[in-house]
Amino acid sequence: MVLAAVAGVGLTLAGSPGASARVATRTATVTKPCGGEALAPKPGGGAWACTFDDEFSGTTLNRSWWVPQVTATSAFTTGPIGSEACYVDSPSNISVSGGALHLTARKEASPFTCSWFTTQYTAGMVSTYTGFNQTYGRFEVRALLPQTTVAGLQETLWLWPVNDTLYGPWPGSGEVDFSEFYSLYSYLDIPYIHYNYSSTTVNAATHTNTVTAYNCQIALSQYSAYAVVWTPGSFTITINGKTCLIDNYVPNGGLTSPAPFNQPFFIALTQALGIGANAFNPATTPLPATTSVDYVRVWK
């Protein structure tokens, strides 16, 4: 989850879900095709099979699949020092209604102590840390982003490795931010794929180690479908079916593709407060701010 797009500063998950996590492979019980969505054949041929599908059609979070992120037990936070977001398991921050999951950042009535810091801000995040993970496949999330063009808000739809120290400290084991929104650049989605590589190997013509893109335009007022197709050695990210980024990854540090992306990853959905050029400003950034998720679908 990149919190400063220009600087490329990354933030890892800590605790549960988080650093040095060890989770057995989890599969979801899917009783219908993924939303009835028809897909083109898989790269290399064959048909996609639905492995996970949450349409958020009820009124409560399916906790057999999703676990809320809680700062008190994980130390995970976003936002600038002095205005950090405390992630809490509260219906004010995480709710399901109207056919969507809603993740909200908000200002509380008064300051409170959250883990090691004092803040007045809370936010919502969920992941399939204990409910579902998969190696390779197609992951798609349809989401509506916060409706603001003022700096300070961030949304991330991402994949995180089950064993996040398998290939050393972050970003050695990889991270896939297949959708990343900064409200300062409200017309763009800026995906980012994290791993160790040599900058001398980047080749736009062959899509070698092209880890990010700055030309993926979005319509802020509409739901968009953000998808990533992950195969051994490559990622293809699309927005509403239009290709946004292709990365044929070639890691360094003694690794050979498909490492480090050759283990299960789980899904994380985050409403965040920004830092850096997109820093949250209590005086100007509008709150509450919500990312609404229409569905999460996965195929293999």
Question: Language-model segments: which ranges?
Answer:
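GH16 jelly-roll
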Residues: A28-K300
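Proteolytic processing junctions in secreted/extracellular precursors
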Residues: R22, R26-A28
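Secretory targeting and sorting signals
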Residues: M1-R22
